[in-house]
Design a protein with these regions (language model features):
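N-terminal Rossmann-like NAD(P)+-binding subdomain of aldehyde/semialdehyde dehydrogenases
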Residues: 1-107
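ALDH superfamily catalytic-core signature
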Residues: 2, 123-126, 130-141, 156, ...
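Short, well-ordered beta-strand elements within core beta-sheets of diverse protein domains
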Residues: 14-20, 261-263, 314-323, 338-343
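Flexible, glycine/charged-enriched surface loops at secondary-structure junctions
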Residues: 21-27, 92, 168-175, 251-257, ...
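Rossmann-like NAD(P) dinucleotide-binding subdomain of oxidoreductase/dehydrogenase enzymes
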Residues: 87, 96-238
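Short beta-strand-to-turn element immediately C-terminal to the catalytic PLP-Schiff-base lysine
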Residues: 230-234, 261-265, 321-322, 344-346, ...
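C-terminal core of ALDH-fold dehydrogenases
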Residues: 274, 325, 330-415
């Protein structure tokens, strides 16, 4: 067996134990993990400092360095996230439906774990803990394969988590890390059908497309966010300016950040200078259509066709003036990724049409796309934002990491 197959078998065996562990046992393991992360914070930060130094030396973009970085505040947030997951209701064993048939059979559906989950993700060490916590609470074993840029941080976190599991009486192998960060190991994980029940990629478009194209393990597609904010002619322009500023600049590297601003022609001459005044405080680069450049000037870079389909993950915003509602919705249908879309308007009927006609996991009226997040939706930490329609859509919390099985009670019925 290969190293990865050995890990897969160990995870499968550990998962059988975890699947029938009670809520109290799982919560005790999560609390042990939270305390262990706090106690071994210096060890984790030292590992992260090595990752950060290597990333900067390699010329990693600042927005990506921000994703990689850990500090005491971020670790405190990670620990709080683990405790929030522990406090959430346990979905395992919940009876979704129960009916009595005419022949006396009592047939119900009960939530059960998916089994063993593989997660492939980029240089975001917080994902290591968020994913492990969610998988543990939902009764799933997990095999983690993070980006090489965060390898030392991920290894430190997983060592802490495995020790915490053991101290709480659960198998260490409920959480495993693929230590080989080569492309070959990623390909092997994508095809580990004997041991993995589902594969979840978290990262940019390139990573997700590679997994979808090459995996034989079933995939839940997450992440790519070409998100739009559409300023309707009926918008409160001050509100709209605040929303696009937040949606673009509060954390541009994440998948729920806005990448494209659409503005009705009727309000563009008034709105675009207001928006630009706010956006320039964060040195946002605008890439605009000809009408945008006619209003704001030549310092706006001409938008190329590819810009309308790009998740920039940086302080870059594509801007297009549209003739009205229909063009805006058609544009989103052509260029959006089904993640998060927002309209700013005081027009009730326009808002309702937008909610009805825009096909995305999260559709907003008068709010920033940045709220598409497990914590903000009351789910606790999320494993990712699913942009597909099968199995799960939107922030994937505990329930989205379960399946169901039918349970049937009889009194001797035969057919």
């Amino acid at each position: 067996m290969t190293i990865l197959e050995t890990q897969g078998l160990a995870a499968r065996n550990a998962g059988r134990v975890l699947a029938v562990a009670g809520t109290a046992a799982k919560n005790a393991a999560l609390e042990a993990a939270a305390k262990a992360i706090e106690a071994r914070q210096d060890e984790i930060l030292a590992a992260n400092a090595e990752d950060m130094a290597a990333a900067k030396a390699a010329g990693m973009r600042p927005a990506l360095v921000d994703r990689l970085a850990l500090d005491e505040g971020r670790i405190a947030g990670i620990v709080e996230g683990v405790r929030q997951v522990a406090a959430l209701p346990d979905p395992i064993g919940q009876v979704v439906k129960m009916d009595t048939r005419p022949n006396g059979l009592v047939i119900g559906r009960r939530r059960v774990p998916l089994g063993v989950i593989g997660i492939i993700y980029e240089a975001r060490p917080n994902v290591t803990v968020d994913a492990a916590a969610l998988c543990l609470k939902s009764g799933n074993a997990v095999i983690l394969r993070g980006g090489k840029e965060a390898f030392r941080s991920n290894k430190a976190f997983v060592a802490v988590l495995r020790d915490a599991l053991e101290s709480a009486g659960l198998p260490r192998d409920c959480v495993a890390l693929v230590e080989d960060t080569s492309r070959e190991s990623a390909n092997e994980l994508m095809n580990l059908t004997d041991y993995l029940d589902v594969l979840i990629p978290r990262g940019g478009a390139g990573l997700i497309q590679s997994v979808v194209k090459n995996a034989r393990v079933p995939v839940i597609q997450t992440g790519v966010g070409v998100c739009h904010v559409y300023v309707h002619e009926g918008a409160d322009l001050d509100m709209a300016a605040r929303i696009i500023h937040n949606a673009k600049t509060s954390r541009p590297s994440v998948c729920n950040a806005a990448e494209c601003l659409l503005v009705d022609r009727a309000v563009a001459p008034d709105f675009l200078p207001m928006a630009w005044q706010l956006l320039q405080t964060k040195n946002v680069e605008l890439r605009g259509c000809p009408e945008t450049r006619a209003i704001l000037g030549d310092f706006v870079r001409p938008a190329e066709d590819a810009d309308w389909d790009t998740e920039f993950g940086d302080y870059i915003l594509a801007v297009k003036v549209v003739s009205g509602f229909d063009e805006a919705v058609d544009f989103i249908a052509a260029h959006g990724t089904g993640h998060s879309e927002a309209i700013v308007t005081a027009d009730y009927f326009a808002a309702q049409r937008f909610l009805d006609e825009v096909d995305a996991a999260a559709v907003y009226v008068n709010a920033s796309t940045r709220f598409t997040d497990g914590f903000e939706f009351g789910l606790g930490a999320e494993i990712g934002i699913s942009t597909q329609k099968m199995h799960a859509r939107g922030p994937m919390g505990l329930e989205e990491l379960t399946s169901s099985k039918y349970v049937i009670y009889g009194t001797g019925q035969i057919r």
